[in-house]
UniProtKB/Swiss-Prot annotation:
This is Nucleoprotein. Encapsidates the genome, protecting it from nucleases. The encapsidated genomic RNA is termed the nucleocapsid (NC). Serves as template for viral transcription and replication. The increased presence of protein N in host cell does not seem to trigger the switch from transcription to replication as observed in other negative strain RNA viruses. Its EC number is 3.1.13.-. Belongs to the arenaviridae nucleocapsid protein family. Zn(2+) binds at E390, C497, H500, C521. GO terms for molecular function: hydrolase activity; metal ion binding; RNA binding. It comes from Allpahuayo mammarenavirus (isolate Rat/Peru/CLHP-2472/1997) (ALLV). The lineage of its organism: Viruses, Riboviria, Orthornavirae, Negarnaviricota, Polyploviricotina. The keyword Metal-binding applies.
Amino acid sequence: MSSENVPSFRWTQSLRRGLSNWTHAVKGDVLADARAIVSALDFHQVAQVQRMMRKDKRSEADLTRLRDMNKEVDALMMMRSAQKDNILKVGGLSKDELMELASDLDKLRKKVQRTEGGGQPGVYAGNLTSSQLNQRSEILKMMGMGTGPRGPVGGVVKVWDIKDSSLLVNQFGSMPALTIACMTQQGGEQMNDVVQALTSLGLVYTVKYPNLSDLEKLTEKHPCLKLITQEPAQINISGYNLSLSAAVKADACMIDGGNMLETLQVKPSMFSTLIKTILEVKNREGMFVSPSPGQRNPYENILYKVCLSGDGWPYIGSRSQIKGRAWENTTVDLEGKPSVNHPPVRNGGSPDLKQIPKTKEDEVIRAIEQLDPRGTTWVDIEGPPGDPVELALFQPETGNYLHCYRRPHNENAFKDQSKFSHGLLLKDLADTQPGLISCIIRHLPNNMVLTAQGNDDIIKLLEMHGRRDIKVLDVKLSSDQARLMEDVVWERYNMLCVKHTGLVIKKKKKGAAPGSANPHCALLDCIMFDATVTGYLRDQKPKRLLPLDTLYRDNANLINL
């Protein structure tokens, strides 16, 4: 499939659905930043930057002016991306996923570099000096080509006459808060009118990409949209330009509940999970990185923005203070030193074989701090309390959950449990982080109250860790009652349960119908029990608190290159 045949909006919709767990209602935060910019930014200087960005040639002084203005805007905003270099290793992502990511980032690097190099025969959009420009003009004139083409079809090539082109990186791109502030302050509009206009444009964006024709029609109802330029988009356009693409990005933030990609927030704790999900959506839809220079397709766009920084708002936040490009700030490590593969202690033993690394313990503490110690907290384990293989804690009011696995000591008992209960396979637990379950239990808040379906095993597990202060409420559902919502939960949340891939044999008691063949997943069971008790499946999206990398040993020996 060529880049011209990309079903762009379908890809966007698929990414919206697949990444809905990471989208947020951001309207209030965007408007708070917009008000801060209106109140404190010198719009005389903004006008000078806008004028400078209309020039065909720009100097070192122009770049300094742009960077200084970007720094002021960044200081005024709460929604920003921070410098965060990401090194992805085998564990949270498989070997194949890491190699796929590395390949796509390299393809994206080549595409971006070709695009910034012009992408048109005979046209260079990079950083020629004034003397080089004059020399080129003379050579082309001598060859009978006049002054040569000044730009690609539909736009003008803007040339920066600067020594260090790396200073241009991350200084462009629009921010909704800045767009709204400029429309309000420079257009002499009420911010509420701007918000209403962008909301109307955003409703169009839920079903199609708004175009200039749509903009013109909406202008009849919302005159402030006349402030949006009718010029086609160009590369390296300033965030201070009121382009249609800037308006579309801003209007996405006005639509709560639309799962807009623009409202994605990336945190270090869930970076691996997000990348894994993006790759899953990509493969399901047949997305790809196109070699053709030009505008990025939806997959290329999200890959670049998310990999640029692992901490912040990749689409709508300020990123002018980030150094480097996406392929520099997110790297893949396929050559980690193999970990020592200790044989498991058979037939029992403590669940805590070794101390968890300090960095991972800190991640656990940060995750637990996000739990509400007074909120309803469901708990479930798979495996016996002396040799658990899975633990889940789930708070239905917020959707926050902790979910981890553990390699068992008693492999024979584990295989029997797999066939008749959880469907976990030993090979999938080989590189799970030892000590993680114990670490979680140790750091749970004092006197916390947990809710469970059957509390005997949970109480035994807590007592093994000296946590007699934690109480466990038993809802005491019958086996049939407990699994009333099973199919509904599996239909909606099966993507949360990726390791229970083994075959489960239905249990059949005399005089009773055969039991379920669905594997017992601790996390999905927590969601299922809550849905059974409340009588409905909540709309609150589950949110992982533990990063995927925390669940696996460092430098797991899964690849040998």
